[in-house]
C-alpha cells in the first residue's frame, strides 16, 4: 500500500509539472513557424531597402526562432514580445539601440510591423518605418 501511495504521489507530481508548462500562444506560433521574406521596407513612406537605404540590411529573410534568437536580413540577434504580444523588440550588436516594432498585422501569410527610430544621419529627425513580410 505504501508503494502505491508513493507511486501515486510521484505520478501526480509529474502530471502537475507537465500540465503547468506554459503553452505557446497563437501569436508566438504564427511568428516563429515560417521564414519571413521581406515584401516592402519603407522609411517615411519611401522604399529604403535599396543600396545605401536605411533598411538595406533588413532586406532578405527574417526568422524568429522559438528560443528568442533570430536573423533579420543580414542581422543576427535576439527578439522578444512585450507582455501583450503586440510589440516585438529586436536586439542586435549591429545596431546601437534595440528596435521596438508595433505589430500591425500577423497572420499565417503576412507580417507587418511599424517603428519610429532616430535617423542616424540626423538625430533630430524621426523616421517612421514600415516593414512588411510574406511567409515563405
Regions found by a protein language model. Name each.
Residues 1-29:
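Bacterial Sec-dependent N-terminal signal peptides
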Residues 19-78, 84-136:
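Lipid interaction determinants
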